[in-house]
Structures are given as C-alpha cells and as structure tokens.
Amino acid sequence: MPSFDIVSEITLHEVRNAVENANRVLSTRYDFRGVEAVIELNEKNETIKITTESDFQLEQLIEILIGSCIKRGIEHSSLDIPAESEHHGKLYSKEIKLKQGIETEMAKKITKLVKDSKIKVQTQIQGEQVRVTGKSRDDLQAVIQLVKSAELGQPFQFNNFRD
C-alpha cells in the first residue's frame, strides 16, 4: 500500500545562513549605524535572539530576519515570534523559537482534517510525524493538496513517499 509521511522540519544550516545574512544586512544599514543591535542563533535551544535599543528597531530587525529566511527557503510560519518584547535596561529583545516537528495537538488536527474529508486513507501519529497510507496514489495526492491548502499555521513537508 502506498504511504508517505507528513513532517515539519527546518534545516538549521539554512537558518544559520539566514541569520548571518541578516547580520550582514544589519551592518550595512544606515539607520543602524552606531546602534547596539544583534541577531544571534542558539542551535541547542533552536532559538534566535534579537536585541536592540528601541522597540521600533526591534521590529525592523525582525523584518530583516524574515526577509533573509524567505530568501533561504524557510517559511515565515516556521518562526514563532512572540508579541511582547522583553526590556532589560536600555535594550529590548525578543526570543524567536523555531517550529520543529509536529506537536500532538497539530497531529490530531491533521488527522481530523483528513478523516473529515472522507478520502479513503488511514493516518497514524508517529512521534513528530504523521504517516498516511491509502490504496491509491491519487488519494495520497489529494491528502497532500488538502494539507497544503489548510491554514494550520505551520509549514509541512511530505517525504518518504512509497508505492
């Protein structure tokens, strides 16, 4: 029986490249001359910390980072950007988490979405991925289109497609 896996992964190497590129853009921006502004990647915790002197500049840095991520093929929805910024002395900062893997709640939403669509396939939650099996390739491709078109707030990849 044909099957495939629905996963949500980010290549940390591409994230590192995006952060380095954003720092390069930051160093050439005229409005950030003489301003203490830093974008740092913590690969262990899978977070990006942005620090600068004002709230407005913080939003500008986030826009620079998002632009760099999109150029590197990382979707905006894979960044979990907090609404409130932290204020320490004269510095403002935000810690952006990278969304890796599919949490159980999201996996249940995907399973419910597929079951409600009445496509003749079975779904199984396997850790941080969802396996979809069906009798025909067309059913599996319909599930791929269904999940892509659903606004679930997280990017998904479809791999391990087997006949």
Swiss-Prot record:
Protein name: Nucleotide-binding protein YajQ
PANTHER family cross-referenced by the UniProt entry: UPF0234 PROTEIN YAJQ
Function noted in UniProt: Nucleotide-binding protein.
Origin species: Haemophilus influenzae (strain ATCC 51907 / DSM 11121 / KW20 / Rd)
InterPro entries cross-referenced by the UniProt entry: DUF520, UPF0234-like_C, UPF0234_N, YajQ-like_sf
Nuclease as UniProt keyword: no
Free-text note regarding domains: Composed of two domains with a four-stranded antiparallel beta-sheet flanked on one side by two alpha-helices.
Alphabetical keyword list: Nucleotide-binding
CDD domains reported in the protein's UniProt record: YajQ_like (cd11740)
Family annotation (Gene3D superfamilies): 3.30.70.860, YajQ-like, domain 2
Keyword check for Repeat: no
GO CC, alphabetical: cytosol
Family statement: Belongs to the YajQ family.
Domain of life from the UniProt record: Bacteria
Subunit structure: Homotetramer.
GO molecular function: nucleotide binding
